[in-house]
Amino acid sequence: MQPKYDYDAIIIGSGPGGEGAAMGLTKRGARVAIIERYDNVGGGCTHWGTIPSKALRQAVSRIIEINQSPLHGNTRLPHTGFSDILCHADQVINQQTHMRQGFYERNHCQIFTGEASFVDEHQVQIHYGDNTTETLSAENIVIACGSRPYQPQDVDFDHPRIYDSDSILDLKHDPHHVIIYGAGVIGCEYASIFRGMNVKVDLINTRDRLLAFLDQEMSDALSYHFWENGVVIRHNEEYEEIKGLDDGVEVRFRSGKRMKADCLLYANGRTGNTDTLKLDKVELEADSRGLIKVNSMYQTAARHIYAVGDVIGYPSLASAAYDQGRIAAQVIIKGQANVQLIENIPTGIYTIPEISSVGKTEQELTAMKVPYEVGRAQFKHLARAQIVGMNVGSLKLLFHRETKQILGIHCFGERAAEIIHIGQAIMEQKGEGNTIEYFVNTTFNYPTMAEAYRVAALNGLNRLF
């Protein structure tokens, strides 16, 4: 009997969300087509977001480490330009693309390279680069088309000195001074990268403190570290006009201030890539930022059409997007999912040094009137940190005074995003498995950064009476 549809599922986008859905479906025998608008798979995560920015950060971090190491005396590395370290990022991108292409090929996912748009509830049209089209049909459709940097209409992003977080990866000159408008995660990460290359950085924050969703101590630590390293932060500022010049960019603010720099990176928000999908054909609509509303099983208002990843908004993390795609695949196959996204998703912010956290902040616990206590460990007191010259950083554990249950973990310092997982694993244990006493009663390798958990746990338990 001829199948009713060409495929069991069409997935629009090949980033982490699309990949998670595709692997979850093909492993269960489903026929899957993937429509990717760009020539290579991987989505924004691989080509413009997570992978290249973290590769840049790694290169800059190593340059800083070598230049500051006492082992090298007064020897410093020769000046390395932005375009030079981009070569390292390109190598990583190529490796990631090749690997992910292999995933799809081995699992018999058919990839179509073109722009997708809905024809009706079960049909999607592909617009190819040669102006031809093809229409595919499927019983289920997964929208995993990601997001792009938000571009306000009154800013000329065609000007060669005005960039967003995608186009900054094509920076051809070596700026001496950069203005970064937007002090969210992306803005702070690039502030670290540029300052690490001895570029003068003005970081414009439209709010009253950096990364307000973080525990305030972590936010304050980042602000202090930026200040100590020469990043100038301007809080509560909004632009009146951003004007491209022959040799740079001038910004006029509503407060009356004016600034000029070699270039400007606009990093103030993102918008979903839904404007070309023709969602009206399936009676769906996106909000003002291009985001699609879904239920707990990632179904849209049309129950056989799913959406995962950045296109549904929070938490907008590559790690979460992959799991969302995997959960959507389960729902498509079984009608329900036997797993769900964990409640406490760790955040990793790849500034120099890193910040990572999972669970509640002190401010949240205080507002909830939870009787908690705090345990702290300073990296500079740990043997491993002293060996590698890691003088900056701390680990902070929040736990219930009576049950000893871990409620939140916050880390500031090199490799924070790796260190956080030790605590996360214990925090996710059920019942009595989640206890701060685990870190006191367990033997870790020594000397390692895991020692921070023992020190912080003892520090916190010693506060109890």
Curated annotation (Swiss-Prot):
Cellular location(s): Cytoplasm
Keywords assigned by UniProt, alphabetized: Cytoplasm, FAD, Flavoprotein, NAD, NADP, Oxidoreductase
Cofactor, how bound (note): Binds 1 FAD per subunit.
GO molecular function per UniProt: dihydrolipoyl dehydrogenase (NADH) activity; flavin adenine dinucleotide binding; NAD(P)+ transhydrogenase (Si-specific) activity
The protein's Enzyme Commission number: 1.6.1.1
Gene3D superfamilies: 3.30.390.30, FAD/NAD(P)-binding domain
Gene Ontology biological process terms, A to Z: 2-oxoglutarate metabolic process; NADP metabolic process
Cofactor(s) named in the record: FAD
Binding-site residues, FAD: 36-45
Keyword Coiled coil: no
Catalytically driven reaction(s): NAD(+) + NADPH = NADH + NADP(+)
SUPFAM superfamilies the record matches: FAD/NAD(P)-binding domain, FAD/NAD-linked reductases, dimerisation (C-terminal) domain
GO cellular component, one term: cytosol
Predominant location category: cytoplasm
Function description: Conversion of NADPH, generated by peripheral catabolic pathways, to NADH, which can enter the respiratory chain for energy generation.
HAMAP family: SthA
Family to which this protein belongs: Belongs to the class-I pyridine nucleotide-disulfide oxidoreductase family.
The protein, known as: Soluble pyridine nucleotide transhydrogenase
The organism of origin for this protein: Sodalis glossinidius (strain morsitans)
Gene: sthA
